[in-house]
C-alpha cells in the first residue's frame, strides 16, 4: 500500500509490481445541470480526475447509479449513462459494468481503477518550501451551479461552467509529469482553500496565495454578489478560517469565492521554481483552461495559508 486514507489524498495507490501501481477511487453525486447527458459527462470527468491528480491514467470503471424510476424516465438515465460512457472513452478507459438502486433522488458516478509508475505518482504530501503553486482551471462552479438550480444563471456563465466541468484533467496531468511535479491535488468539494490546506498539512508546510492571480469563471463574481452561494461553500470557509489569514480589505464574497465547492475542478500543482517555465509551457501546449501561478509554498505552521490582495509577484 503506497497511499491510503490516512494521508487525505485523492485516491488509494497499491503497488502490484516494481514498475506498476494501481489507483483506486470513487465519486458520485446528484445532478448539478438540467441536461442528463451533460450531467453524465460531468460526473464521469469528476470521478476520473482523482486518477489524474495522482499522476496516473484511468483504465477501468464501474457505473454507480441511484435512480427514482417511478419519477424520472429511463430514457433520461440512458442519456446520463451515454454521457458518462463518452467521457470515459475520451479518457481512453472502459466501463466494465456497475450497479444501480432505486433511489428517491438521481445520482451518478464511477468507481475508477487507474495505473501509475510508483516512482512517478503525485500526492498531496510532497510539496516543498519554495515550490510555486499553479492552478489549471478557473474556479466558481459551485456558485454557478447554485444559480442554475435557481434559474438565475446567465447563458455565458452556464456555458463557461459546463465547459470547465466537462474538460478532463488529462492534459494537466501530462504537463505535470513532463515538468517532474511530485505534489498535486484536484480542487473539488472542499474548494481551493480546503484542498490547498490539505496539501500543506500533509506536506508539513505553509503557503501564500494572491487572490488576484486566481482565475474565475465568467459571471461567477456577479452571481456570488447576488447571493448564489452553496451551503458547502459556506462550510468550507468556516472550516478554513482556523488556518487562513487574510490581508485587510477582503469582503465576505471574496473569501467565499476562494472556498467555493468545485465539481470537476482543475489540478493544483506544486512545482519547483526551476521547472515552472517547462510546466507553464506544457500546460499551454496541452490546452488547459488555465495555467495560473497563484502563490508559493513556504515555511510556517503546517496547513496555514496567507491570502494577499492583488496579483502574484514572485
Features from the language model and the residues they span:
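Glycine-/charge-enriched secondary-structure boundary and capping motifs
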Residues: 69-94, 101-108, 178, 184-314
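Glycine-rich anion-binding loops of enzyme active sites
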Residues: 16-32, 38-41, 57-154, 192, ...
Amino acid at each position: 500500500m503506497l497511499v491510503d486514507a490516512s494521508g487525505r489524498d485523492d485516491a488509494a495507490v497499491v503497488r502490484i509490481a516494481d514498475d506498476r501501481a494501481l489507483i483506486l477511487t470513487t465519486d458520485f453525486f446528484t445532478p448539478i445541470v438540467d441536461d442528463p447527458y451533460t450531467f453524465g459527462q460531468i460526473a464521469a470527468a469528476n470521478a476520473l480526475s482523482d486518477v489524474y491528480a495522482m499522476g496516473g491514467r484511468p483504465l477501468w470503471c464501474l457505473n454507480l447509479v441511484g435512480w427514482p424510476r417511478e419519477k424520472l424516465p429511463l430514457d433520461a438515465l440512458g442519456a446520463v449513462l451515454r454521457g458518462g460512457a463518452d467521457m470515459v472513452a475520451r479518457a481512453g478507459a472502459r466501463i466494465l459494468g456497475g450497479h444501480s438502486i432505486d433511489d428517491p433522488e438521481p445520482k451518478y458516478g464511477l468507481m475508477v481503477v487507474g495505473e501509475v509508475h510508483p516512482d512517478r505518482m503525485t500526492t498531496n504530501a510532497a510539496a516543498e518550501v519554495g515550490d510555486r503553486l499553479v492552478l489549471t482551471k478557473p474556479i466558481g462552479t459551485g456558485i454557478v451551479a447554485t444559480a442554475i438550480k435557481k434559474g438565475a444563471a446567465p447563458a455565458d456563465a452556464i456555458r463557461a461552467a459546463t465547459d470547465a466541468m466537462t474538460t478532463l484533467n488529462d492534459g494537466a496531468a501530462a504537463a505535470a509529469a513532463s515538468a517532474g511535479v511530485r505534489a498535486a491535488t484536484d480542487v473539488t468539494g472542499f474548494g481551493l482553500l480546503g484542498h490547498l490546506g490539505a496539501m500543506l498539512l500533509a506536506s508539513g508546510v505553509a503557503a501564500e496565495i494572491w487572490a488576484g492571480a486566481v482565475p474565475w469563471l465568467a459571471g461567477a463574481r456577479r452571481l456570488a454578489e447576488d447571493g448564489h452561494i452553496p451551503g458547502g461553500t459556506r462550510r468550507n470557509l468556516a472550516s478554513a478560517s482556523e488556518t487562513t489569514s487574510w490581508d485587510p480589505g477582503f469582503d465576505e464574497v471574496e473569501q467565499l469565492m476562494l472556498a467555493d465547492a468545485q465539481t470537476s475542478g482543475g489540478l493544483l500543482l506544486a512545482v519547483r521554481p526551476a521547472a515552472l517555465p517547462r510546466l507553464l509551457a506544457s500546460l499551454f501546449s496541452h490546452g488547459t483552461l488555465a495555467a495560473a501561478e497563484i502563490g508559493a509554498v513556504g515555511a510556517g505552521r503546517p496547513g496555514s495559508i496567507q491570502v494577499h490582495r492583488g496579483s502574484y509577484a514572485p
